[in-house]
């Protein structure tokens, strides 16, 4: 769906809405909206997209291994399930002082609030169950200025955080069980400030 468009010298709102259906072993959806409002002095935009998907991978393994003149038959069935959702957001505003000078402010965010992975393996050698939950988010804010006399200046800040939790259980053919839990994460904060001056000779 596309809203009304406008010529560059006009003021008005234009935009687009989209949606989709993904078919794999399991289904998923995606969709989004984009809007742009313009005046002779201002450009303001908004973009949002989301994507949800789930799928399964299945494998069966049959093999014969020889160890010390003995032949061992190995049969394993493996299932891997994945599902997760991603949100993407961007909004920005530009103000034009004149044809040669403007200032821009933009925000970008990416969010993965819940991504689940589950793998299960069962056979005559071992039975294993592995579950992982992950989440991540990223924020970026950028302010840029261009003067009419060749100076560029700006500030850019990025924040990123992720977490992962894993639970693993394994039982061998002698009924001996091992289990562990892990938690990991990462946090990044990054600043960038710049000033540049150029002259035309």
Segments from the language model and where they lie:
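DNA polymerase sliding clamps and clamp-related checkpoint/processivity subunits
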Residues: 161, 167-174, 183-185
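Extended amphipathic alpha-helical scaffold segments
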Residues: 118, 165-166
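Solvent-exposed loop segments that connect transmembrane elements
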Residues: 66, 71, 169-178
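Membrane-proximal, glycine/serine-rich, low-complexity loop/turn segments characteristic
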Residues: 1-119, 128-160, 196-201
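Beta-propeller domains
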Residues: 138, 168-169, 190-191
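Outer-membrane beta-barrel transmembrane domain signature of Gram-negative proteins
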Residues: 181-201
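Short, conserved phosphate-binding/catalytic loop or strand-edge motifs used
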Residues: 122
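Juxtamembrane helix-loop boundaries in multi-pass membrane proteins
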Residues: 127-131, 175-183
């Amino acid at each position: 769906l596309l809203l009304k468009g406008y010529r560059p010298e006009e003021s008005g709102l234009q935009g687009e809405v989209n949606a989709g259906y993904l078919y794999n072993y399991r289904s998923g959806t995606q969709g989004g909206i984009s809007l742009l409002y313009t005046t002779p002095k201002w450009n303001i935009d908004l973009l949002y997209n989301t994507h949800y998907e789930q799928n399964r991978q299945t494998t069966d393994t049959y093999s014969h291994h020889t160890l010390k003149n003995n032949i061992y038959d190995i049969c394993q069935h493996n299932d891997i399930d994945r599902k997760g959702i991603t949100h993407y957001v961007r909004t920005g505003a530009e103000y034009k002082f004149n044809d040669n000078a403007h200032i821009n402010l933009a925000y970008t965010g990416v969010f993965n609030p819940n991504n689940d992975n589950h793998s299960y393996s069962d056979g005559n050698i071992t039975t294993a169950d592995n579950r992982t939950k992950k989440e991540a988010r990223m924020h970026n804010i950028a302010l840029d200025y261009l003067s009419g006399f060749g100076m560029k200046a700006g500030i850019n800040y990025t924040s990123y955080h992720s977490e992962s939790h894993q639970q693993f259980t394994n039982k061998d053919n002698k009924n001996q069980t091992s289990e562990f839990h892990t938690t990991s994460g990462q946090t990044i904060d990054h600043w960038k400030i710049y000033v540049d001056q150029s002259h035309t000779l």
